[in-house]
Regions:
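N-terminal secretory signal peptides that target proteins for export/translocation
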Residues: 1-13
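C-terminal motif of bacterial Sec signal peptides marking the signal peptidase cleavage site
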Residues: 26-29
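Short, low-complexity, disordered segments immediately C-terminal to signal peptides
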Residues: 31-54
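N-terminal capping segment at the start of a domain
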Residues: 49-95, 310-324
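Active-site-adjacent substrate-binding region
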Residues: 56, 64, 92, 115-117, ...
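A non-catalytic alpha/beta surface segment that caps or lines the substrate-entry region
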Residues: 66, 75-135
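Active-site-proximal beta-strand/loop segments in catalytic clefts of secreted hydrolases
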Residues: 80, 112-114, 132-134, 143-147, ...
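Acidic/histidine-rich catalytic neighborhood of metal-dependent amide-processing enzymes
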Residues: 156-265, 285
């Protein structure tokens, strides 16, 4: 993944959150007592509101959590990493393409192929889209990139967390969607290609002036442009991105470059499943696969843990290996992603983009 900014701000501490909560409860209790004394019925609670002030009415509790097999997802991850580095244009890159396709046999799959003109020359790019139809009019996109950093192609860098963990996550989500009729929106799983910059992007002591701005996100930018041209973009209700979600010390950032109301839905899904302590403890601004869709007015949420080791020390280094990842982290993010989809299915209408 590539970063616009690594600015992070800490959310209020737990102690302050408890104090604020206690004050709010005290005020609510006083209002309730006042209404009761006057023989009035307390007003119903207002719907949750996002940081822009737009009201968001969430579906009620939807029952048992969705299934997600984290051990199987972890096995997919290990098999992807076993191919070795998978930079754009390399033999291992093609092997991972074929591996993903082999796990989607029998599913409706669209191949989006084109040639990208990059600072390193022209390269074939291959986006893979698995489509699971629903009864409601609209599409929820769940995305992950699968390539590894091109400048590190001659090292042992395998991108276990960056590109590997999220690609494995989507394969297991496909298992949970497969063969189960959907009453909600259609879900399209996208393994997008050529996300990483072809030139050094400032990580690992490389020159910061080598910016990602015109040298990354090739696959997802092409897809956003294509879907804008053929009318698909208007049908997309939400774009959910997973990136760097396998860290054993999982802390998903609140991305300030995402859509506030959709991030709030993700937070609600985490809360319902008891995983809220792993979400939104920090704010961040991330330039990631969702940006081309955000720019075109699609509601987006980037689920990313951009603290991979102390001060993100393992990111874009050969130390990004499977031993630092956990099936439990895959379980948390996979379950929250599926619960988010369930909540979105029941929200009618969805907030404005």
């Amino acid at each position: 993944m590539v970063a616009i900014s690594r600015t992070r701000t800490r959310a209020p501490s737990k102690s302050w959150r408890w104090i604020l909560l206690a004050c709010m409860l005290a005020v609510l209790a006083c209002d309730h007592d006042k209404d009761a004394a006057q023989g009035q019925t307390p007003a119903p609670a207002a719907p949750a509101a996002d940081t822009t002030g737009a009201a968001v009415t969430l579906a009620p509790d939807l029952g048992p959590p969705p299934a997600f097999d984290s051990d199987r997802a972890m096995q997919y991850l290990k098999e992807i990493v076993k191919f070795g580095p998978r930079p754009l244009g390399g033999a291992n890159h093609k092997k991972v393409e074929d591996y993903i396709a082999s796990r989607l046999k029998g599913d409706p799959v669209e191949d989006d192929n084109f040639t990208a003109d990059t600072p390193e020359g022209k390269f074939p790019v291959h986006n893979i889209i698995a489509k699971f139809p629903g009864k409601k009019d609209g599409i929820i996109v769940v995305a992950s990139h699968y390539d590894t950093n091109y400048p590190l192609r001659r090292t042992s860098y395998v991108g276990a967390n960056d590109g590997g963990s999220s690609s494995a996550l989507l394969l297991e989500i496909a298992n949970q969607l497969r063969g189960r009729p959907r009453d909600g929106y259609s879900v399209w799983l996208v393994w997008d290609d050529a996300e990483e910059a072809m030139k050094p992007d400032g990580s690992g002591g490389l020159p910061q002036e080598m910016s990602f701005k015109d040298d990354s996100l090739y696959g997802v930018t092409h897809l956003a442009e294509k879907w804008q041209g053929d009318g698909t973009l208007k049908k997309i209700k939400a774009f959910l991105l997973a990136d760097m979600i396998g860290d054993a010390d999982l802390n998903i950032d609140r991305d300030l470059n995402s859509t506030p109301w959709l991030e709030n839905v993700v937070g609600e899904a985490a809360k319902r499943l008891g995983y809220q302590s792993h979400f939104f403890g920090h704010n961040n601004e991330v330039g990631d696969d969702h940006i081309p869709f955000m720019k075109r007015g699609v509601a987006c949420a980037d689920l990313i843990d951009f603290t991979y080791g102390y001060n993100n020390v393992f990111w874009h280094t050969p130390q990004d290996t499977v031993d630092k990842l956990s099936p439990q982290s895959l379980q948390i993010v996979g379950s929250v992603m599926l619960e988010t989809i369930r909540i979105l299915d029941k929200m009618d209408p969805l907030p404005p983009r």
